[in-house]
């Protein structure tokens, strides 16, 4: 294991105490969820694409609080559907993760780079 410098014990059993209140918060905002788009997003909990079901999406979001993130499964699921994988934001951490499973990931680290990259696609 690698010790990470984090602000809270995310994705561990220590987060179980907030699962019930978090479920309540998600239920309060459930009307703003567009579950038809859920199958376009991978779940950190399952490592697969979400189902178009409000109960499943909320269950996955709550479960990810106290369970390990399934990075490799997420990356493989994303790569299986994508013609090209892009990482948008500062730094290039995902590029290296994808490289470990043999997938090329183009990093887009600034606004001008994003404009150039996505103008081509």
List where the protein language model places each region.
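Acyl-group transfer acyltransferase/transacylase scaffold of fatty acid/polyketide systems
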Residues: 1-121
């Amino acid at each position: 294991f690698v010790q990470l410098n984090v602000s809270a014990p995310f994705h561990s059993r220590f987060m179980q105490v907030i699962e019930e209140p978090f479920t309540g918060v998600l239920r309060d905002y459930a009307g703003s969820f567009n579950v038809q788009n859920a199958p376009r997003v991978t779940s950190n909990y399952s490592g697969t694409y979400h189902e178009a079901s409000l109960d499943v999406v909320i269950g996955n979001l709550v479960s990810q609080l106290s369970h390990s993130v399934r990075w490799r499964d997420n990356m493989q699921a994303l790569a299986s559907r994508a013609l090209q994988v892009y990482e948008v934001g500062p730094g290039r951490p995902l590029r290296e993760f994808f490289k470990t499973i043999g997938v090329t990931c183009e990093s887009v680290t600034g606004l001008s780079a994003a404009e150039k990259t996505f103008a081509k696609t």
